Amino acid sequence: MTYILILFLTYVLHLLLKLNWVCTAVVLVFLLVMQHFHRIKGQRFQEARKRFLDVSLYIDTLLYSFLKEQKIIRAFEDVKSTLADGHMKETVSRAIDHMMLTFDETEVFVDAMRIIEDEYKCNRIVNAHEFMAHAEYYGGDIKESARILLKDKSAWERRILRNIEDRQRMFHQIILSVVTSVIISGIILYLPVLSIDISSNIIVQILSAALIVLDDLIILWGQKFLEVDYLGIDLLPEDDKHAKKLEEYKAYNPAKELRASILMAVIPALASAFLLYTDRQWPAVAAMGAALICLNQHRIGHRLMKKNLIADVKSAFPKWLMDLALLIQSENVQVAIQKSREHIPVILKEEVNTLVERLDVEPESSDPYHRFLDCLNLPEINAAMGMLYAVSIGNSGNCGSQIDELITKNLEMLDVADTARLKDKTAGMYLLFLAPVITASFKMIVDMAIFLISFLSYKVV
């Protein structure tokens, strides 16, 4: 059926773009080859989407079952019976076998759950497993922690599903843009002007075939935005360069950077003076603009650094606060902050270490909380740290409601930050939506030029 559709599409393109049979054969061979790559990318998208849905069902079933049974092995058995046949069920079966058949290890459950974590790289799975392992070994009230994890998971699921829908919608728009550009390019060849037909021109034929090739490659590129790993799409970078961004921002020295900017501005300033002296005013204006940019490059760079840093911090802070909220269920705030360093986003690592050091010196003071990330002056973070301090001192004797409010605000912050990050990651699809316009415009310009030349030749004759 696929090959019949390709033959039909090729014949339509042959008629629409007035392709000769040689170019038609080239287009047919190209489309037959490319359909293999399109099929592979389509399958990868379906697999990535299924992996996400499997993980979503796994976390839900696991946590609800653990709340009911309060035993890891029983929770996993319930998950296995719920899942449909597939890779996730096979992985859960291997984890259960490890639990049942291993007798010489002290952390059997942890090692068994790591089997699933290695197959599905997802922070929500790790958080659920760590919560279950802690509850299994140490006991305690698990309802509140499970509720936090389930709320976070539900918000995460909604974000990713919404992002998948956005990507599919934008991909369909790319296809529509391609179809429209090809149709418009074909219409030009049917303009009834003096019976002039430029379609037989070799340049027009080559450009028509090239248009089809480029537009198909645009569609293939668009498919790359669909086949991403949706389990890790919202993960933050963990490299050393990312870890040092906050320290580099704090180390900014305006006086030193100004001196560097002045040195950079000397050459374009001298060039501007020389151009004015030689009465070349427009080049002099361009040189003046370059000098002004060089003179202010340190300010521009610092503002861009702050903008990017704020975006990263707004994504990292709610993730750290979520881990903190889980730890607070069984620890006091100061101990929870110390333990949270194990999974903290790298961009906050040094700042949290500084917070711990300040709390060691002033455990009852609000100053360490208020000085956290004070260099960025973000109201939402300041408010969250103020609430955290109130919880630490047990203000008003109602810590439960304060923690609930903290979690609610944190989930809102996380939703806004991650939604913005996911939207930024699909920005390239908008450029692909515009790409067929560029290819079609170029072909139309060349076609009109050839038409004009043919028209003038016709008039001369």
Pin down the residues of each PLM region.
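Bilayer-spanning, highly hydrophobic alpha-helical transmembrane segments
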Residues: Y3-L9, K151, E157-L220, M264-L270, ...
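Long, mid-chain structured domain cores
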Residues: L19-T24, L28, F45, G86-E90, ...
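Long, solvent-exposed extracytoplasmic domains/loops
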Residues: H87-A133, A146, E351-L359, S365, ...
